[in-house]
Design a protein with these regions (language model features):
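Long amphipathic alpha-helical segments
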Residues: 1-80
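Glycine/charge-rich, flexible interdomain linkers and switch-proximal surface loops
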Residues: 77-94
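Cytosolic, long alpha-helical scaffolding segments
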Residues: 83, 101-103, 110
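Short acidic-hydrophobic, aromatic-tinged amphipathic segments that line or gate anion-handling sites
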Residues: 187-193
Length: 197
């Protein structure tokens, strides 16, 4: 299982698949393979990314390897106590077409066992709120990389309040900071994908 974690960090998807299958055959519980192998490896990559020891391409390759492993485990996990820890609605706000930061956040959140509904880019406030209702989400996560699109985040916060939704709003992106988060009344601010946990 330790080896699976190391292979995730190297992004070696084929070897991950082989070892996950071997671990299952050897009788290791699927939840252990997931938590101590796949997720542990992704966590380690998250820390390295935060410390600038690895960069976006390495994170994406590791995520691909992790997802291949998760695909094999899925049928086994559905039979066990591995339940989703919650649902997050994720998207880049209206007028903003940047998605690399959002995609990293998605990977990190899924790695924590959260269900992520990715709405993509250029998402208006109404859409965030509608999807949160449909999926009974606990968190709406908005990303913006342009100062001009930041006000869209406030629209999301205001609409959540207006609709009396029991949903937390998390914001992130290059121009955003904790002061802005406080100013618009959002619940959480994250300055990088790895801290989105």
């Amino acid at each position: 299982i330790e080896e699976i974690s190391e292979l995730i960090q190297k992004g070696q998807a084929k070897k991950v698949v082989k070892l996950v299958n071997e671990a299952l055959e050897a009788g290791f519980p699927a939840t252990d393979i997931l938590n101590q192998g796949l997720l542990k490896g992704m966590d380690a990559i998250g820390v390295k990314f935060k410390n600038e020891e690895v960069f976006v391409p390495e994170v994406l390759v590791a995520a691909r390897a992790m997802n291949k492993g998760i695909e094999i485990l899925k049928p086994y996990l559905q039979d066990t106590e591995h339940q989703s820890k919650g649902t997050v609605i994720l998207g880049t706000v209206k007028g903003d077409l940047h998605d690399i930061g959002k995609n990293l956040v998605k990977i990190m959140l899924e790695g924590k066992g959260l269900e992520v509904v990715d709405l993509g880019v250029d998402v208006d406030a109404q859409k965030f709120v509608e999807e949160a209702k449909i999926h009974q989400a606990q968190i709406i996560c908005c990303s913006a990389l342009l100062t001009t699109t930041m006000p869209e985040m406030k629209k999301v916060v205001d609409l959540v309040a207006q609709e009396h939704l029991n949903v937390k709003v998390m914001i992130g992106g290059a121009p955003v900071n904790q002061d802005y988060c406080n100013e618009i009344g959002a619940d959480y601010y994250t300055d990088d994908a790895t801290r989105s946990e």
